[in-house]
């Protein structure tokens, strides 16, 4: 195989929401939310009963989604969604509940692909009556499409009508509510034509921002500019105001028009209507410098209509919500009112549901669902009304800005949270827990809501009850007494010499009149038929009827008089099969009268039976037709239970080891059959391997066997229910759960103690729980969410984290540097308070006493920084030490260095700067601060500070010394008594050193704008020499060495690429002991003498913030793990065989043709957004193969000379074998 080939897999999708719409997309009364997360569209369905949000659908569009808008045709009951993307096309999607998919209804091309400033797609607005839509670009271009129905009542879309305005920058577009008059769109725009022709710059300073109305004349099929009015030059957002005459209620819905949100003010504007303006109350901040104060902007808004009224919620950039109401007489406005409502995280989108919920799509971090407790009408907070000011507040003299102090939630209460890692600033995969797979330690979040997270692959478990038992049970069951019971009534525990029966009520207590035999251990418990119970014990079967009458069946005796025992059994609601120690199977079936009848013949197996299973009886059927039996000759046999071939053998499968447990379960997997559940036969082996095979419902043959190693312990399987669906638990050295999520079968470990046995549990206080045994302890627990496969353990941080470093010897100990711009540090707050010269009363302190985690840090002017260094125990999830930085010093880099000159003592070095200006990058002073680690690294002690000449952006340990990227210089420092000693430097780097990695004496340097530069340290001459670089300039964010000659790097535009040095160049550099030959080589293309060649290139679509070479599964190959700024986690898996490369690249090319992007983006062009994709296969695209129709799957598989099942199996092996996800 020539060169390197990689397979890209997304392990955790982006969590950053950039667009949100609400509507009745299913066509029912229930409202749903569609959110855009990078290249992914998700349909969320809030449960109005529980207040939980379920992710119903997640679809990768393979294109950048820029905007969303929902509309409904007049008289329709179903909402459609319009998508603006980087495809140069407008796309209308319809949600199909039957297939749980988004279907493309219309796709119209209007421009070039890519996110360009004059190609529409950035802004979308619809007419409130669903008659037209406007799609706009950042500059000049605006198109209007008419939406209508044809004779068959299908949605139609017209040709585009141009509403272009040359030399105009567009800031926002919104549809104006005019009832059934000609559709009207409002645009916020700036004309720069005069600025282009004025060399003095005066026209640029005086450029006016205008509110312009564009009218679509439905009669003439033409768009005209109807009205234009200058607005505040700092206006940034338009909000639609209800309007139009309501024929049903015989009254006006509202005054129509728009609210123009600008800095500190909100203004109502409409043609031929008086202006009304209200101020946006500002937070009371006594230490703010009023001369440098930055005004308050509105960043999100939502309109909510009720039967006879409407109101708006608008949100400022601090997260404060304000309620805006209007008084109007018919279609004329009387007054505009504003009032503080509550404070929530800053949102990219707000949605109010009719059921009384507010969905907050947070700009950073988790998405939140709140419930309205009240509408804030009855509290004593002041309300500001436009009529209280001169000229309704719209005169030349603007209303004075009132102040307020935010308070904890009063009108809202949080009911659900959808966790998100967005943004990830830095991450490290390590394994301090010594688990099967590494944990990812990530620095996430922004501002005071930041956190340091330990991410573990698995489902989170919430424990409800933990109780000690008198002994160690071998098994546990729960059962209802009758079929109609809503909840379980009994918990049955089997011990070596007896059985304990507990009743489930307000308390759990022992019962003696259950009818069960308690003097013997139990093998199985089943609720049988309508109202009977069944107990299988080693010496027989006990059938307990509803009137407590007991029917017994005893095991038969052998010819020598010894009684046989039951060694294995399986049951369902209507059937019972037991295996005797004489290697015979005995079959029982429930008749229509509720009697349990034994089938006359017994089946001799010819080998000892170890385990067996049959699925639940299908609804409306008398019996299930198949039984799986595992024997001690390492085979599994499928036995028929049909009346005409009872206990006849159908098929046999050989195993690599004897079976320890079998579980048959009917579960839905859309990659196998999207319409019906598939019968899976799960076989756990004694060597810790799990086999999953499919039982052919017609022939009874076992097909498509997949294997997975679970641990060193024999596997025990239990059929259970999770979130109302069939699931299978596999118990080995870890507990695993097989379940269906979004119509795909998942197999994920539980983050919980190792269970010895488990069963489903349903009680009034815990309706969807599970019960398990850990040693002699009984545990009752729930799985709150199946949506996320990563369990998050968090430590709260004070400011935005910048970099993390781990202690090399103390497992799980990390150091985080945090820095926040435009924020006052505690020391600066104290100094400014003292400068006021007076004691502030409680009501005057305003934001000084607020909790930053809830309300955000105290805002300050540009150039103010708050920063700290924190030692974190990642495993225990606690801060062990925190060091606040003062004097406007901010930390940007960190490294743990074992200095050779100090007998390998581990020191912490932090790179920081004072009075940092971000653009252009500058600082007053910069330092490398060295800390001694005390208490095994849990505390820090300042050793000394070393002043340097630029901001240290990256630090790294290197051969017992410190390697530092300080501005354009790369330096090596050693430890001195009073400061760090500069030993060596190279100042030839073009922009700034932002990333470093090293092997031996070779160093790879990531430059801020000029890609990767290879350097070598020559100890004889104590010299750092650069000898190779990249041909193309790239804005590097991270780099890591894959081997001595190969480096993987990522840039600011979402690309990952791999560079490799020529072998001869590499050898000649190493063979030159002084570096003099390299120094005198002729530079090529104004750079280094040698050029690295590009091996692989791929557009991920997210800015990469960490790159690491690591093995994700025990004994698995190493992969390149990356994390993205928007919360995504992915892996690039290297291929090991040419056959796999050929198969999957052919599959990828077929899927590019078959699987059209729902936004109309060409897949190859998307993955080659900045440079052509090279040597990387898109695993996310390949995995959509299972979602194609069976006919398409067969056609593509035929081209590859394979069956669809084999391709799905290969894709699953690549994902599970390399990443474990």
From Swiss-Prot:
Domain of life: Eukaryota
Keywords associated with the record: mRNA processing, mRNA splicing, Nucleus, Spliceosome
GO CC list: nucleus; spliceosomal complex; U2 snRNP
Subcellular location(s) of the protein: Nucleus
InterPro entries: Beta-prop_RSE1/DDB1/CPSF1_1st, Cleavage/polyA-sp_fac_asu_C, RSE1/DDB1/CFT1/CPSF1, WD40/YVTN_repeat-like_dom_sf, WD40_repeat_dom_sf
KW Nucleus (keyword) present: yes
Biological process, per Gene Ontology: mRNA splicing, via spliceosome
Quaternary structure annotation from Swiss-Prot or TrEMBL: Associated with the spliceosome.
Entry similarity comment: Belongs to the RSE1 family.
Entry protein name: Pre-mRNA-splicing factor RSE1
Organism annotation: Mycosarcoma maydis (Corn smut fungus)
Gene: RSE1
């Amino acid at each position: 195989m020539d060169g390197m080939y990689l397979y890209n897999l997304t392990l955790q999708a982006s969590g950053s929401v950039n667009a949100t719409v609400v509507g009745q997309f299913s066509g029912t009364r229930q409202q749903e939310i569609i959110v855009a997360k990078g290249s992914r569209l998700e349909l969320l369905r809030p449960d109005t009963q529980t207040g939980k949000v379920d992710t119903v659908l997640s679809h990768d569009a393979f294109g950048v989604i820029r905007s969303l808008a929902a509309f409904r045709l007049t008289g329709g009951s179903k909402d459609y969604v319009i998508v603006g993307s980087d495809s140069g096309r407008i796309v209308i999607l319809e949600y199909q509940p039957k297939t749980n998919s988004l279907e493309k209804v219309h796709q119209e091309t209007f421009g070039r692909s890519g996110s360009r400033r004059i190609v529409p797609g950035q802004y979308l607005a619809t007419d409130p009556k669903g008659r037209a839509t406007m799609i706009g670009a950042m500059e000049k271009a605006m198109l209007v499409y008419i939406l209508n129905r044809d004779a068959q009542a299908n949605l139609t879309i017209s040709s585009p009508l141009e509403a272009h305005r040359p030399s105009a920058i567009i800031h926002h577009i919104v549809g104006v509510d005019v009832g059934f008059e000609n559709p009207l769109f409002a645009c916020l725009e700036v004309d720069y034509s005069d600025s282009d022709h004025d060399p003095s710059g005066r026209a640029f300073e005086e450029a006016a921002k205008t509110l312009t109305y564009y009218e679509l004349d439905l009669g003439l099929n033409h768009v005209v500019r109807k009205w234009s009015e200058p607005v505040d030059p700092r206006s940034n957002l338009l909000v639609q105001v209800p309007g139009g005459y309501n024929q049903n209620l015989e009254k006006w819905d509202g005054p129509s028009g728009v609210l123009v949100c600008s800095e500190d003010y909100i203004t109502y504007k409409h043609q031929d209507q008086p202006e009304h303006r209200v101020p946006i109350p500002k937070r009371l901040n006594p230490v703010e410098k009023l001369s440098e104060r930055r005004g308050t902007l509105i960043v999100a808004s939502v309109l909510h209509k009720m039967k006879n009224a409407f109101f708006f919620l608008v949100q400022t950039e601090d997260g404060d919500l304000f309620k805006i109401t209007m008084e109007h007489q018919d279609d004329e406005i009387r007054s505009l009112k504003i009032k503080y409502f509550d404070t929530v995280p800053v949102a990219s989108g707000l949605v109010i549901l009719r059921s009384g919920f507010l969905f907050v799509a947070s700009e950073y971090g988790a998405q939140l669902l709140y419930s309205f407790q009240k509408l804030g009408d009855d509290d004593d907070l002041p309300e500001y009304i436009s009529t209280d000011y001169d000229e309704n507040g719209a005169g030349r003299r603007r209303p004075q800005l009132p102040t307020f102090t935010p308070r904890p939630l009063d009108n809202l209460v949080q009911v659900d949270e959808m966790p998100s890692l967005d943004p990830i600033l830095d991450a490290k995969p390590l394994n301090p827990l010594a688990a099967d797979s590494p944990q990812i330690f990530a620095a996430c979040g922004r501002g005071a809501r930041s956190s340091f997270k330990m991410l573990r692959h698995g489902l989170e478990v919430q424990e409800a009850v933990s109780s000690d038992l008198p002994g160690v049970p071998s098994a546990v069951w729960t059962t209802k007494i009758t079929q109609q019971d809503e909840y379980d009534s009994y918990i049955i525990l089997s011990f070596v010499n007896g059985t304990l029966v507990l009743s489930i009520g307000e308390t759990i207590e022992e019962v003696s009149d259950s009818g069960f035999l308690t003097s013997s251990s139990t093998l199985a418990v089943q609720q049988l038929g309508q109202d009977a119970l069944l107990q299988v014990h080693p010496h027989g079967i006990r059938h307990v009827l509803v009137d407590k009458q007991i029917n017994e069946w005893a095991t038969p005796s052998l010819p020598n008089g010894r009684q046989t025992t039951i060694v294995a059994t399986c049951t369902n609601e209507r059937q019972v099969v037991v295996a005797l120690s004489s290697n015979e199977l005995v079959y029982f079936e429930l008749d229509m009268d509720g009697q349990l009848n034994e089938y006359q013949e017994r089946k001799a197996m010819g080998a000892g039976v170890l385990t067996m299973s049959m699925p639940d009886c299908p609804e409306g059927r008398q019996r299930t037709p198949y039984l799986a039996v595992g024997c001690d000759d390492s085979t599994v046999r499928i036995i028929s239970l049909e009346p005409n071939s009872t206990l006849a053998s159908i098929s046999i499968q050989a195993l690599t080891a004897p079976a320890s447990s079998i579980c048959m379960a009917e579960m839905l997997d859309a990659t196998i059959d999207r319409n019906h559940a598939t019968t899976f036969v799960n076989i756990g082996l004694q060597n810790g391997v799990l086999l999953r095979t499919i039982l052919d419902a017609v022939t009874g043959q076992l097909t498509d066997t997949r294997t997975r190693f679970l641990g060193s312990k024999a596997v025990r399987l239990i059929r259970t229910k999770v979130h109302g669906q069939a699931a299978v638990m596999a118990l080995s050295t870890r507990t695993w759960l097989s379940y269906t999520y979004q119509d795909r079968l998942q197999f994920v470990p539980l983050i919980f103690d190792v269970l010895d046995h488990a069963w489903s549990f349903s009680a009034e206080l815990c309706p969807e729980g599970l019960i398990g045994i850990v040693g002699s302890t009984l545990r009752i627990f729930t799985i709150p969410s199946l949506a996320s496969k990563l369990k998050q353990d968090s430590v709260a941080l004070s400011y935005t984290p910048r970099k993390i470093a781990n202690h090399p010897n103390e497992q799980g100990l990390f150091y985080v540097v945090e820095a926040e711009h435009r924020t006052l540090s505690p020391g600066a707050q104290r100094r400014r308070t003292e400068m006021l010269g007076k004691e502030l009363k409680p009501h005057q302190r305003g934001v000084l006493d607020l909790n930053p985690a809830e309300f955000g840090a105290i805002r300050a002017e540009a150039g103010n920084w708050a920063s700290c260094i924190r030692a974190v125990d990642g495993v225990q999830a606690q801060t062990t030490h925190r060091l606040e930085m003062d004097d406007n010093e901010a930390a940007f880099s960190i490294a743990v260095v074992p200095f050779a000159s100090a007998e390998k003592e581990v020191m912490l070095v932090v790179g920081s700067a004072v009075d940092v200006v971000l653009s252009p990058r500058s600082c007053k002073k910069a330092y490398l601060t060295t800390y001694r680690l005390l208490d095994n690294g849990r505390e820090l002690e300042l050793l000394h500070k070393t002043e340097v000449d630029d901001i240290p952006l990256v630090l790294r340990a290197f051969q017992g010394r410190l390697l530092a990227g300080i501005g354009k210089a790369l330096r090596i420092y050693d430890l001195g008594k009073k400061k760090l000693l500069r030993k060596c430097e190279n100042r030839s780097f073009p922009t700034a050193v932002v990333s470093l990695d090293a092997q031996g004496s070779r160093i790879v340097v990531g430059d801020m704008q000029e890609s990767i530069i290879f350097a070598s340290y020559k100890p004889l001459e104590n010299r750092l020499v650069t000898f190779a670089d990249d041909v193309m300039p790239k804005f590097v964010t991270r780099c890591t060495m894959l081997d001595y000659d190969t480096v993987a790097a990522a840039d600011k535009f979402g690309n990952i690429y791999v560079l490799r040095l020529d072998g001869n160049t590499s050898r000649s550099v190493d063979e030159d002991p002084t570096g003099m030959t390299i120094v005198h080589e002729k530079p090529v293309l104004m750079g280094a003498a040698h050029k690295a060649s590009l091996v692989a290139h791929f557009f991920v679509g997210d800015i990469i913030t960490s790159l690491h070479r690591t093995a994700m599964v025990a004994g698995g190959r190493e992969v390149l793990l990356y994390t993205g700024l928007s919360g995504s986690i992915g892996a690039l898996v290297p291929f090991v065989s040419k056959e796999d490369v050929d198969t999957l690249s052919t599959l990828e090319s077929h899927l590019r043709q078959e699987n059209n992007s729902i936004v109309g983006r060409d897949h190859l062009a998307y993955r080659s957004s900045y440079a052509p994709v090279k040597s990387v296969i898109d695993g996310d695209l390949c995995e959509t193969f299972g979602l194609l129709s069976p006919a398409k799957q067969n056609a593509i598989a035929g081209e590859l000379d394979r069956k669809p099942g084999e391709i799905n199996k290969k894709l699953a092996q690549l994902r599970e074998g390399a990443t474990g996800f």
